Amino acid sequence: MASQTQGIQQLLAAEKKAAEKVAEARKRKARRLKQAKDEATEEIEKFRQERERAFKEFEAKHMGSREGVAAKIDADIRVKLADMDRAIQTRKDPFILEILQYVYNISPEVHKNYNHK
């Protein structure tokens, strides 16, 4: 009986040791997965920063700075408004005279669709 108890104890000890090894292997696997995930995240972030930097360079090269674009738009608007003001000043008096002629020179006529019965 003592040999059976000793055999059972050895089996229990072996089972416990195997469970510890399995648990340790799971922990190592979890650590490796976490490390791989961290490395992948870091690599993705580096790639994203590199692409962002390349895009900023491309944008600066082809579009100029935003302030420069805004200044150019403002200058274009000022030029167009000045042109409109000049056009208004040159055409205002003849236009007003033409409108006044229509108002003052009324020639009453019977409408062509009017039927007098």
UniProtKB/Swiss-Prot annotation:
Annotated knockout phenotype: RNAi-mediated knockdown specifically in pHCl-2 expressing enterocytes delays pupariation and reduces food intake. However, knockdown in other enterocytes has no effect on developmental timing.
Cross-referenced InterPro entries: V-ATPase_G
Molecular function terms from GO: ATP hydrolysis activity; proton-transporting ATPase activity, rotational mechanism
The keyword Transport is annotated on this UniProt entry: yes
Superkingdom in the source lineage: Eukaryota
GO cellular component, as recorded: plasma membrane proton-transporting V-type ATPase complex; presynapse; vacuolar proton-transporting V-type ATPase, V1 domain
One of the protein's GO biological processes: liquid clearance, open tracheal system
Entry keywords, A to Z: Hydrogen ion transport, Ion transport, Transport
Assembly and oligomerization: V-ATPase is a heteromultimeric enzyme made up of two complexes: the ATP-hydrolytic V1 complex and the proton translocation V0 complex. The V1 complex consists of three catalytic AB heterodimers that form a heterohexamer, three peripheral stalks each consisting of EG heterodimers, one central rotor including subunits D and F, and the regulatory subunits C and H. The proton translocation complex V0 consists of the proton transport subunit a, a ring of proteolipid subunits c9c'', rotary subunit d, subunits e and f, and the accessory subunits VhaAC45 and ATP6AP2.
Family listed: Belongs to the V-ATPase G subunit family.
Its biological purpose: Subunit of the V1 complex of vacuolar(H+)-ATPase (V-ATPase), a multisubunit enzyme composed of a peripheral complex (V1) that hydrolyzes ATP and a membrane integral complex (V0) that translocates protons. V-ATPase is responsible for acidifying and maintaining the pH of intracellular compartments and in some cell types, is targeted to the plasma membrane, where it is responsible for acidifying the extracellular environment. In enterocytes, acts as part of a pHCl-2 sensory pathway which mediates Tor-dependent larval growth and metabolism in response to zinc availability.
PANTHER family: V-TYPE PROTON ATPASE SUBUNIT G, VACUOLAR ATP SYNTHASE SUBUNIT G
Protein's recorded name: V-type proton ATPase subunit G
Organism: Drosophila melanogaster (Fruit fly)
